[in-house]
């Protein structure tokens, strides 16, 4: 799975920096190849920087306490369960952490399959039974084993590149149109041009978010299938059913919630990073 705000803020910062650098360097939007190179550098660069610092960012933003020496039987069981599932999935043991939140949630993050973090909320850890928690952990381990962190980063890089490129191409067309109808042929001017680019960044960014959310929902179904293989289908179904009874989600930043077990509800399913729980349960029962 706050994640939506963090993701939007990160991407807006990337787009703003891209605009400033392009203006300073005098990148000509009519030169498609040059613009595309800049768009790709900032689009993929920002996405991969986010991936590289994802574990550090998750620990800081969520206040994750990594379990190095289990303090009680619950923590010991948690670490042992993740270790067993990681071995089954053929990945290196992730770091295991707990963060304080009453919501029933968990997430996986990290730059690679063999450098990852699996974290669970205190609400989930003490509000669900062992079978349900085992299934949740299996779901998160499956995210790691499926390489979903890198997959979603690549998708984010592509859509970032599209947003940067398309916004400036359209702004260039508008600028040329204004210049052709201006006696002095000056066009929009730098500040007006940047304002148009910013608005277009927002509009195309909404479309990009819908695309990323679509792929995220697909990965959720896959992680549910993987969780069912590692923990058992009935346990996975029971865990998803239990999530429906838990507190409303919303404390997790968007950069983590896409790889969480329980997504934030939205009136528009197109914008949801997770399919509705009923659909996920139905898909498991039909498999």
Curated annotation (Swiss-Prot):
Keywords: Cell inner membrane, Cell membrane, Hydrolase, Membrane, Metal-binding, Metalloprotease, Protease, Transmembrane, Transmembrane helix, Zinc
InterPro entries found in the cross-reference section: HtpX_protease, Pept_M48_protease_HtpX, Peptidase_M48
Cofactor(s) the protein needs: Zn(2+)
Transmembrane residue ranges: 4-24, 33-53, 154-174, 195-215
Intracellular or extracellular location(s): Cell inner membrane
Active site, per annotation: 140
GO molecular function: metalloendopeptidase activity; zinc ion binding
Signal peptide: none
One BP term from GO: proteolysis
Pfam families membership: Peptidase_M48
EC number: 3.4.24.-
Domain of life: Bacteria
Any one annotated GO CC term: plasma membrane
Binding positions (Zn(2+)): 139, 143, 220
Top-level EC class as recorded in UniProt: hydrolase
Cofactor, free-text remark: Binds 1 zinc ion per subunit.
Record membrane topology: Multi-pass membrane protein
PANTHER family: PROTEASE HTPX
Family, similarity comment: Belongs to the peptidase M48B family.
Name the record gives this protein: Protease HtpX
Organism: Shewanella piezotolerans (strain WP3 / JCM 13877)
